[in-house]
Amino acid sequence: AQHMPKEFTPGFAEHLASATGLDVVEGYHGMALSPGQVVIAPGGVDSQIRRPFENHFALDVRKHDKSPIHPSADLLFQSSARACESPIAVVLTGMGDDGSKGAADYAQRNYPVLVQEPATCVVDGMPGSAIASGAVSEVLEVSQIARQLKRWCGEHQRPQTQLIKTN
C-alpha cells in the first residue's frame, strides 16, 4: 500500500517491473492474486485481500471510511492477516502511523513484521510507530529486507517469528 496518488501508481508498477524483472502490476477490484506476482495498490482507494474459496485470493478495492489515508497499510495488513496462512508485513519509510495497527494484528497471530531501520528512512514515522507498537519481528535496512523476503519466499515455508523488545 504505497501512499501515492492514483495517477502515479501505474507508472510506479511499470518502473518496479523494469527495475526488478518481477511481474509487477497495479491491482484492481476483483483481481485474482497469483503466486510470484507483485501487486501495487491503486492510489486513492484501499486494497484488502479476501479469500473467496480455498487456495484462491482476490483483491477487494474500494475506499473505506476506517482510514484517512488511501491506500491504507493498516487495512491491507489486517485483511491479509485474516485471509492468508503465512503473510509477511513490511513497513517502509513514510509519515504517520499507518501500518502499526495492522502490524499488531500480525503480531497477535505470530506473523512476521519487517520494518525499515528508521535511521535509513527519508521519513521515519511509519517504521517508528510500528516499532513503538511492539509488533515488530525485525528492524532491517532495505537491502536486508529484500534478502529476507527472497529467502522466505524461495523456501515456500512459514518464517519463524519472535517479537523484538522495545524500550
Where are these regions (language model features)?
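Conserved acid/base catalytic micro-environments in cytosolic active-site loops
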Residues: 1-167
